[in-house]
């Protein structure tokens, strides 16, 4: 039986394929389908190509937006020759030239939730101007902004920069020393100071500028200075080290190196190459347009992998970078060890060390990385990280600990586990939530122009719409095939057109593999018909008759038909397989028909054995026998192996019968079968059907059986992911051929991730609508 194919039926109306048709809901898309096809206007396609070229160029323009906050701190560094002169006067010029109309400084354009960021940046700029006695008019306007918006200092609805209470309170003290009278409510000032006192007891080296003279800067530099001369890659903290401890050549060299790239301002983090590359690759994948930039992404990840192998501090001194690099590299088939994440296994140790104030972003990225365990023993580090990060984020959600909606949404998605989500639906949601003015926040808010821009947004929208057009065209082709072969006379309703094509897009999203996708959908429908006949529609003698007809394929006429039902069935089945075998022969340059037929024959014989031997109670299979047989009858072997011939890759029969392929279909089949058994165990126990739960309950309790089955499931899921991601020495199997098996299991995980049938039906109805029909601007 096809995994989850008929467990829930939903109604979906569409003029293209008939109104009020019902379709099977249990299916999942593994990742996005993107297509380039002819467009109505040349100018539109030219714009599409131009945008793609500009996005490609962005791989070489890896920078962040200017940080008023950090630039102000650098501006406050005194000259090495005179304490009465600025070391970097160009920063003062930038501050004077970049005050906003309302008198503030900060991210431009700003955001309604960034008032604390604007207050922090504005106060830092006022300190710099006051210290060097310049910009009287700018100071006056800046104080006006603080007077108007000072109420936001303690507002819980505003997004706080990292260490805001510590740093802002410290800057208030600095203003007092400079005789800069701040128009702030005294009660608010005292509140901030109280929060500073409680926060400063923690490990706050990253916000050292907020500790000021109380910090042991000599010890700080000794412990935390990086090879590039910075403290935490933070221009502000490094500048503070020179303000309070003026004797470090490497700190000066670091700040000077920034001005080799930026004339008179600094970003909130530098260097930015690793950060920008990781975020750009991740964003392209989330938008579902990464296939357009394969060579650029490969080059970027090769560079990240080189730095990973060198244990470069740009990766390993930053929790977010380390976790993102591990995730992106492992999922892109690079050999990376989870040992590099060992220092994050303990929650208490994590929050007490590393010198840097922790944000939910770091914990979110650690959690994403922790889901990529592929070995029970070697990846126990990931299991430990997964346990505490999951508990931490669940508690945050429970306490409503996220101010902005996007952060909360990201966490909710991450907690669903990446292998139980639909990437195609997530691509759409990511595009809809994508904003060219999106920002992130450290000690100051910042943007990445090469990651958030109108080109990438327009490109992603256009690409998604082209993909939808191809989906609709292929659905029409499938409908014509359904009608030409009169599948309805075999009991297959037209509603299965959507459902079967959904499976095809799930497993084969690549737009150029249309033949493979349509073949997959046709196989799903044929398999449904076969399953119906061998399960209940046909008698035992009719099933034997069908098997004999398939065995004597080229001489089937000499066999004869037991009934008209068998004749109608075999006529449709024969024509369908002959058609698909012809296409496969053209693609492979040789006949593969016998192999395709033998795969069907094996499936049918085992289906009949289940019915005659197992369901009748004549034979009770062992656990291993049960898993082996049901993996095959669950289509884990037939469809993925047959699909290989349609992928545009020449592949030998020997390779398809290799131990590697056997391991892949066996693991994916076990995953699908176990997921099904866990969900259907209650129903099948009442029906006295054989499943893994009932087999294990002969020697243990139901609770123990379910626990044991979940262990087997997790072991096989990890083993499958390992076989797909880890490059086996001497393997001749193309990567795409292996990916098919993981995508199939991912679809099963999504199908069985919900136990509420109504919820599945509603979610899948929306899923089909959004993927195939609904415009992005809907």
Swiss-Prot record:
Gene coding for it: PHS1
Cofactor(s) the protein requires to work: Mg(2+)
Principal cellular location given in the protein's record: plastid
Reaction(s) the record says it catalyses: neryl diphosphate = beta-phellandrene + diphosphate
Location of the motif DDXXD motif: 531-535
GO biological process: gibberellin biosynthetic process
MF GO annotations: magnesium ion binding; terpene synthase activity
Subcellular location per the Swiss-Prot or TrEMBL entry: Plastid, Chloroplast
Natural source organism: Solanum lycopersicum (Tomato)
Residues at which Mg(2+) 1 binds: 531
Annotated function: Monoterpene synthase catalyzing the production of beta-phellandrene from neryl diphosphate. Also produces lower amounts of delta-2-carene, alpha-phellandrene and limonene. When incubated in vitro with geranyl diphosphate, catalyzes the formation of acyclic myrcene and ocimene as major products in addition to beta-phellandrene.
InterPro entries (alphabetical): Isoprenoid_synthase_dom_sf, Terpene_synth_N, Terpene_synth_N_sf, Terpene_synthase-like, Terpene_synthase_metal-bd, Terpenoid_cyclase/PrenylTrfase
Protein name: Beta-phellandrene synthase (neryl-diphosphate-cyclizing), chloroplastic
Domain notes: The Asp-Asp-Xaa-Xaa-Asp/Glu (DDXXD/E) motif is important for the catalytic activity, presumably through binding to Mg(2+).
Annotated positions binding Mg(2+) 3: 676, 684
Domain of life: Eukaryota
């Amino acid at each position: 039986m096809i995994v989850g194919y008929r467990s829930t039926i939903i109604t979906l109306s569409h003029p293209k394929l008939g109104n009020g048709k019902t379709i099977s809901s249990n299916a999942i898309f593994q990742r996005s389908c993107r297509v380039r096809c002819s467009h109505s206007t040349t100018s539109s396609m030219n714009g599409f190509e131009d945008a793609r070229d500009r996005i490609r160029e962005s791989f070489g323009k890896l920078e962040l937006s200017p940080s008023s906050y950090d630039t102000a701190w650098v501006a406050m560094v005194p000259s090495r020759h005179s304490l009465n002169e600025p070391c970097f006067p160009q920063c003062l010029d930038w501050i004077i030239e970049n005050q906003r109309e309302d008198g503030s400084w900060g991210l431009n354009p700003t955001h309604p939730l960034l008032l604390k960021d604007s207050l922090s940046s504005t106060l830092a700029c006022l300190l710099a101007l006051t210290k060097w006695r310049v910009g009287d008019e700018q100071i006056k306007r800046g104080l006006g902004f603080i007077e108007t918006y000072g109420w936001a200092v303690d507002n819980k609805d505003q997004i706080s920069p990292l260490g805001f209470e510590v740093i802002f309170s410290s800057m208030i003290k600095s203003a007092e020393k400079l005789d800069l009278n701040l128009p702030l409510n005294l009660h608010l000032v005292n509140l901030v100071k109280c929060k500073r006192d409680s926060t400063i007891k923690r490990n706050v080296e990253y916000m050292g500028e907020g500790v000021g003279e109380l910090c042991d800067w000599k010890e700080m530099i000794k412990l935390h200075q990086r090879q590039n001369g910075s403290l935490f890659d933070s221009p502000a903290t490094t500048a503070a080290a020179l303000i309070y401890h003026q004797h470090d050549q490497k700190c000066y060299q670091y700040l000077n190196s920034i001005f080799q790239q930026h004339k008179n301002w600094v970003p909130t983090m530098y260097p930015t190459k690793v950060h920008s590359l990781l975020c750009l690759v991740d964003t392209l994948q989330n938008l579902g347009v990464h296939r357009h930039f394969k060579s650029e992404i490969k080059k970027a990840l090769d560079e990240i992998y080189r730095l990973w192998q060198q244990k470069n501090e740009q990766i390993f001194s930053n929790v977010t970078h380390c976790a993102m690099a591990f995730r992106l590299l492992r999922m892109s088939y690079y050999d990376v060890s989870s040992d590099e994440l060992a220092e994050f296994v303990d929650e208490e140790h994590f929050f007490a060390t590393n010198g840097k104030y922790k944000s939910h972003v770091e914990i979110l990225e650690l959690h994403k990385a922790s889901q990529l365990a592929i070995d029970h023993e070697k990846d126990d580090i990931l299991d430990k990280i997964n346990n505490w990060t999951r508990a931490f984020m669940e508690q945050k959600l429970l306490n409503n600990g996220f101010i902005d909606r996007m952060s909360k949404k990201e966490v909710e998605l991450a907690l669903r586990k990446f292998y139980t989500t639909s990437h195609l639906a997530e691509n759409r949601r990511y595009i809809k939530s994508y904003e060219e003015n999106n920002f992130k926040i450290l000690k100051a808010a910042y943007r990445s122009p090469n990651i958030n821009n109108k080109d990438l947004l327009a490109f992603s929208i256009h690409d998604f719409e082209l993909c939808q057009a191809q989906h609709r065209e292929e659905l029409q082709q499938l409908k014509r095939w359904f009608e030409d072969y009169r599948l309805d006379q075999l009991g297959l309703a037209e509603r299965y057109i959507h459902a079967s094509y959904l499976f095809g897009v799930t497993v084969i999203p690549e737009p150029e593999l249309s033949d493979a996708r349509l073949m997959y959908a046709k196989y799903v429908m044929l398999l449904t018909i076969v399953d119906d006949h061998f399960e209940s529609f046909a008698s035992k003698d009719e099933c034997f008759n069908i098997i004999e007809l398939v065995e004597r394929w080229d001489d089937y006429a000499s066999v004869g038909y037991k009934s008209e039902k068998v004749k109608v069935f075999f006529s449709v089945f024969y024509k369908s397989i002959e058609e698909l075998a012809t296409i496969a022969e053209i693609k492979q340059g040789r006949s593969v028909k016998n192999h395709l037929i033998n795969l069907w024959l094996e499936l049918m014989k085992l289906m009949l054995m289940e019915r005659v031997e197992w369901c009748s109670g004549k034979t009770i299979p062992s656990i291993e026998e049960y898993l082996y047989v049901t993996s095959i009858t669950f289509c884990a072997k037939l469809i993925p192996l047959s699909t290989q011939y349609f992928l545009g890759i020449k592949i030998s029969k020997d390779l398809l019968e290799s131990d590697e392929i056997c391991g892949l279909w066996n693991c994916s089949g076990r995953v699908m079968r176990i997921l099904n058994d866990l969900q259907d165990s209650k129903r099948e126990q009442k029906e006295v059907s054989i499943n893994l739960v009932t087999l294990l309950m002969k020697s243990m309790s139901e609770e123990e059986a379910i626990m044991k089955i979940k262990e087997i499931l997790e072991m096989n899921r990890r083993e499958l992911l390992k076989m797909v991601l880890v490059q086996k020495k001497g393997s001749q199997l193309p990567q795409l051929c292996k990916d098919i098996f993981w995508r199939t299991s991912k679809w099963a995980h999504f199908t069985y991730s919900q136990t509420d049938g109504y919820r599945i039906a509603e979610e899948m109805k929306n899923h089909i609508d959004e993927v195939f029909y609904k415009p992005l601007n809907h």
